Amino acid sequence: MDAVILCAGSGTRLYPITENRPKPMIPIAGKPILEHIIEKIENHVEKIYLVVGFEKEKIIDYFYGNEKIEFIVQEKQLGTGHAVLMAKNYIKGDFLVLNGDVIFESDILEFLNYENAVGLSKVDNPENFGVIELGYDNKVINLLEKPNEDEIKSKFTSNLINAGIYKLENFVFEILENLLPSERGEIELTDALKKLIESSKLYGIELNGYWNDIGRPWDVLSANNYFLKNIMPKISGNIENNVTITGNVIIEEGVTVKSNSVIEGPVIIKSGAFIGPLAYIRPNTVLMEDTFVGNSSEIKGSIIMKNTKIPHLSYVGDSIIGSDCNFGCNTITANLRFDDEPVTLNIKGTKVKSVRKFGAVIGDNVKTGIQVSLMPGVKVGSNSIIGANCLVDKDIEKESFVYKKDELIIKKRN
């Protein structure tokens, strides 16, 4: 059996961290989302076909050389069904399909017991997903894509949703070939599922344990926390005197931790990172390759991507910081509202409540001057510069230059 993983989309709801990388390549617990998915299935399939599109080179370069993996380029993103159809000439038997942004704990083996099956997850907000209703013997009897509250009340009693994992027979390719485009002008995989439902050929498998469709920035941190709970400690690198390390911490070769720094696991610090002196790395933090956290800086519950520098007297909490950033002295990410309500983020023009504590989302190659403060939920686009003494309380588009124009008054004392 083979597998198809859908990796071609651009992930606009996760801007700015997807401005320069495909969503499946966002690092979670030290490795891309896509690598976590591949590790879940690679021992159960012969070939894995990655359908790539947006920033495809980043996926191809990372996984090139893995004999089990082949790449299929979807030049135009014409829907999930079209992406699956791209694999028709490569696959001769039954196959798995997985969305390239889904993290799941459940074992994939149960899917192999069915001819056609869809993974299901129970959620509190089914209106954000495709809702599925099960009948006798776990057969799927209805599917409604992102229903509103009235549709849920009138048509469904289910809070089971499509979890983005499928086992399909080969004839599904024929169904996909004969589908008409949706209102969005795309060939939808869910329309093929509806054809299977009409002929009573689709079963639902409720997933056990953790599941997360990585669609919004706080989903990234949630998945990061999930994986960090299960790491085993391994300390390498150059650890100087008077460094305190507690909990489960992974420090790779090539890391330097200067004296009087404190690291509280779970934490992963990748090769080439430089920590301290007097740095404080708090739980649920991942520092990717060649990062720098300097004197008296504190990082908590955050992902800091490759080659980013947070040199001194700064605080980064519950945030996602892109690669190649450089923070000036005393750069602060606020992560809590006075009213203790969930932090609100702007997602594609709509204000969406996230979680109680959430900091900032910073794109790649962002530079801040001294004493820059970022309010909870703020996003800063890639290649932007924020000048000294700025309080950033709104989203900043990529390629922006932000500065505050104060007038300095100088008078003689007498």
Curated annotation (Swiss-Prot):
It catalyses: N-acetyl-alpha-D-glucosamine 1-phosphate + UTP + H(+) = UDP-N-acetyl-alpha-D-glucosamine + diphosphate; alpha-D-glucosamine 1-phosphate + acetyl-CoA = N-acetyl-alpha-D-glucosamine 1-phosphate + CoA + H(+). It is an enzyme of class 2 (transferase). GO terms for biological process: UDP-N-acetylglucosamine biosynthetic process. Pathway: Nucleotide-sugar biosynthesis; UDP-N-acetyl-alpha-D-glucosamine biosynthesis; N-acetyl-alpha-D-glucosamine 1-phosphate from alpha-D-glucosamine 6-phosphate (route II): step 2/2; Nucleotide-sugar biosynthesis; UDP-N-acetyl-alpha-D-glucosamine biosynthesis; UDP-N-acetyl-alpha-D-glucosamine from N-acetyl-alpha-D-glucosamine 1-phosphate: step 1/1. Keywords: Acyltransferase, Multifunctional enzyme, Nucleotidyltransferase, Repeat, Transferase. InterPro entries: Bifunctiontional_GlmU_arc-type, GlmU-like, Hexapep, NTP_transferase_dom, Nucleotide-diphossugar_trans, Trimer_LpxA-like_sf. CDD domains: LbH_G1P_TT_C_like, NTP_transferase. Residues 1-208 are annotated as: Pyrophosphorylase. One of its GO terms (molecular function) is UDP-N-acetylglucosamine diphosphorylase activity. Residues 209-228 are annotated as: Linker. Residues 229-414 are annotated as: N-acetyltransferase. UTP binds at L6, C7, A8, G9, Q74, G79. In the N-terminal section; belongs to the N-acetylglucosamine-1-phosphate uridyltransferase family. Catalyzes the last two sequential reactions in the de novo biosynthetic pathway for UDP-N-acetyl-glucosamine (UDP-GlcNAc). Responsible for the acetylation of GlcN-1-P to GlcNAc-1-P, and for the uridyl transfer from UTP to GlcNAc-1-P, to produce UDP-GlcNAc and pyrophosphate. This is Bifunctional protein GlmU.
